[in-house]
Amino acid sequence: MIDILFSAQAILGQVLSGRSLSASISGGASSVRLEGRSSAAAKNAVYGSLRHFGFLDFAIKHLMRQENPQIKALLVVAIYELEFTGAPSHAVVNAAVDCAVKMQLGGLKKLVNGVLRSYLRKSEEIKSSAQENLVATLGHPTWWINKLTNQYGQKKAEEIMLASFIHPPLALRVNTRKISPQDYKNTLASSARSWRVPGISGASEAIILEKPVPVSEIPGFSQGLASVQDVGAQLAAEILDLQDGQRVLDACAAPGGKSTHILERASVSLLCLDQDHLRMKRVKENLQRLGHRAKTRVADAANLDAWWDGKPFDRILVDAPCTGSGVVRRNPDIKWIRREEDLHSFSEQQQKLLSSLWKALTKGGKLLYVTCSIFQEENEHQVEWFLKKHPDAEIAAYHGEDIGHNLTPNKDHDGFFHALLEKK
């Protein structure tokens, strides 16, 4: 237990200081190395602590007159273990005290012990008080709660935020170039894997495993029979309206999930762009594993002079950089490290990408704008802005929605926005 708490508090401490969770775990020399049998438990503790950080932070403020930043992360993780995992309380408290010593904070071990024992005595009182605090009950910062409430209304906004507490499903996409969905389902059944089909149209290759497993245990994964991809992300290739023989651009391709799906849906000439060398490496690995071919290039898609040969594309996919507000259950750090002002900087990036790439689209061609955001500023407002700026653009309705298809998170999928723009 002490190793779990020590690693988890070190990672969480970096996140609370503003670093992303992925960078804190695997982001170079300053990241926390997770090794051995306790690594999975430490990761679970961090993810759980971030999902429930609103309540855990509320509890610590209730228990301490003045927070001590040196032990804040340790207390958050320890209270998470006490409240949400069923771990023996004495084991958690003792391990947290020993962890303080291991952190070279032996002078604070009595404080750690006192706060945790106080929580055990007052937990019911704290949970009752927390019911009156929206940040504690909904698990999101105040600005986020207000924005979603204004946008969706109170009931829908609460449904969206409470969905972030649910462990995300493991969704697969069948590679129909190698096997049919039914044959792959038979493969799952023969390997004693239970599965279900998501309740959403347009994702005909999607299968959700009832019990998540490591990638190495997914039947046929290494042979390229399937990919791991959220069901919502699988809609892009459907909405893009692909036809054989087309020239297609995936402008922000990494890690390659949508690129490879495009190649499974139609026989097209595909160019994959991404401005990150390491992320482009993942695109190439996925192409190879699945048995697909595409051109790849490391470049900033918005800078046409750096990569475009002047030949227009029939289809362009713009999976734009965004806040990631639709995928917080997979990346629970997002809601605590993002700031409301980040919406402006992402909005500028998105507008630059759209305006630049529109020039590379042929007349009669279609551009699909995608985000994994649920904020209007990155979605409907961007499309409205684009249509005003570009009179040769028109929106292609999908599911009867005039400005775009807004997919909010639920048990089957994350949150996404899709808008298909056609060049007159």
Residue ranges and their predicted role:
Residues 1-424:
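S-adenosylmethionine
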